[in-house]
Amino acid sequence: MAKLTKRQKAIAGKIEAGKAYNFVDAAALLTELSTVKFSESVDVAVNLGVDPRKSDQVVRSATVLPHGTGKTVRVAVFTQGPAAEAALAAGADRVGMDDLAAEMKGGDLNYDVVIASPDAMRVVGQLGQILGPRGLMPNPKVGTVTPDVATAVKNAKAGQVRYRTDKNGIIHTSVGKVGFDAVKLKENVEALIADLKRIKPASSKGIYVKRVTLSTTMGPGLVIDQGSLDV
């Protein structure tokens, strides 16, 4: 069995095994335990009462967090005409059609979000093997295939997070940075859970939000007392 590092021992000594933490207390503890030299992301994992093997119980969507994620988001948009002008005005970093596709085929993939208008999917369809594995393929279910590309760009820049249940029925996403005020982190998580409840699959039975766990990039996961969340 591998030995714990000095940092791991220090962290383990401050965490109560089996405890469900008040959200604000958990956020404060994660900040205290963050000793790395970069600004860590604060992530949440939500265990849902779904069977991900059933297609009608796969939860996939996007939520605009009220306080964003603290990350600078680069957005590329496939569209043309007036929609292209609107996308640029909304803050898109790159807008194009075949020219943008050629750049991506050449390896220029320095984007966090790729958006497309429906008429551009004939071009985007060629990029499935490039964008798909990177989680960048536009999809109407998360609002990245839309005629209103300007709003999609604004949402992405404002800190919209996209998520999908994994094979264990858990969604994972970033909800901010260690430097965020605990109340802002809490409101971001509450917005996410409210959205998850809104899109609850009709066939899901029993407890839907089973567990909420908060963590940092390099830190431990703390189970949250859901009674401390206003959802």
UniProtKB/Swiss-Prot annotation:
Which parts form a coiled-coil structure per UniProt?
none
UniProt KW rRNA-binding keyword: yes
- Stored Gene3D superfamilies: 3.30.190.20, 3.40.50.790
Please list which residues make up the signal peptide: none
Question: What role does this protein play?
Answer: Binds directly to 23S rRNA. The L1 stalk is quite mobile in the ribosome, and is involved in E site tRNA release.
Q: How does it assemble?
A: Part of the 50S ribosomal subunit.
Alphabetical list of PANTHER family matching this protein? 54S RIBOSOMAL PROTEIN L1, MITOCHONDRIAL, LARGE RIBOSOMAL SUBUNIT PROTEIN UL1M
State the protein's name: Large ribosomal subunit protein uL1
Q: Which gene encodes it?
A: rplA
